[in-house]
Regions:
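Amphipathic alpha-helical packing segments from all-alpha helical-bundle domains
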Residues: 102, 128-166, 177
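Basic, helix-initiating cap at the start of DNA-binding domains
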Residues: 1-41, 45-54, 71
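Hydrophobic alpha-helical segments that form the core
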Residues: 106, 110, 157-181, 185-196
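Amphipathic alpha-helical segments used for helix-helix packing
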Residues: 108-130, 177
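Short coil/turn segments at alpha/beta junctions that flank glycine-rich nucleotide-binding fingerprints
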Residues: 40-44, 114, 153
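DNA-binding alpha-helical recognition surfaces that contact promoter or target DNA
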Residues: 50, 64, 74-75, 166
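Alpha-helical structural segments
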Residues: 25-36, 40, 54, 71-94, ...
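Short hydrophobic/aromatic patch on the recognition helix
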Residues: 56-66
């Protein structure tokens, strides 16, 4: 009896592990499909039906993870804000010129690891924003903190961390998109960002 009981527990554990793996795989497919479609058409321009068709999953599977497409968009966006904050935290305490280089590296690294999500940050609408507001504000606060470090070295072209934050919001990601397929993407992006933000 004991052997049969142990075998049953092992079988149940195996089934649970397989179910967990399947759920994780399905969620990842929804995230990838949503990220691609949202980046191409905007969040408002994509329906749940289009997401599940792209992911090749059922409507029931979608709603098992997300209440609506705004929750899906938030799940795509939150990791990029978290990763960005973690990267910016590593720049604290660096000399101003190294912080400036590290800031550009942060944008380039995020582009490599969270490209579609990064593209969405510029098209967040009023329906999605409440889902990611706290992380968005925290990222901007961390970014401003690093810009203030750079400002302390009298390096900012406009002499203002706050104004440079606005410049980055308008140009940081669009420039990544522009140079994305260029053979010298990293060099051109770095040179462009330095020209926009840092004194010669």
């Amino acid at each position: 009896m004991m052997g049969a009981s142990n075998a049953s527990r092992r079988a149940n554990a195996s089934r649970r592990a397989k179910a967990a793996y399947r759920d994780s795989e399905h969620r990842e497919r929804l995230l990838e499909a949503g990220a691609r479609l949202f980046a191409l058409h905007g969040i408002a321009g994509v329906s749940v039906a289009e997401v599940i068709a792209q992911a090749d999953l059922s409507r029931a599977t979608f709603y098992g993870f997300f209440a609506n497409k705004n929750e899906l968009a938030a799940a795509i966006l939150l990791p990029v804000f978290d990763a960005g904050q973690a990267a910016l935290a590593k720049l604290e305490g660096l000399p101003p010129h190294k912080a400036a280089d590290g800031l550009i590296d942060t944008y380039l690294d995020l582009w490599q690891t969270h490209k579609n999500a990064l593209l969405l940050t510029g098209i967040i609408d009023s329906e999605v924003f409440p889902y990611i507001a706290s992380q968005h504000h925290a990222f901007n606060a961390a970014l401003l903190k690093i810009l203030q470090v750079i400002e302390s070295g009298d390096l900012l072209r406009n002499n203002s961390a706050e104004l440079t934050l606005e410049v980055l919001a308008k140009t940081g990601i669009p420039l990544l998109r522009i140079y994305n397929n260029h053979d010298h993407m990293e060099r051109l992006y770095r040179e462009s960002m330095l020209a926009l933000t840092i004194k010669v």
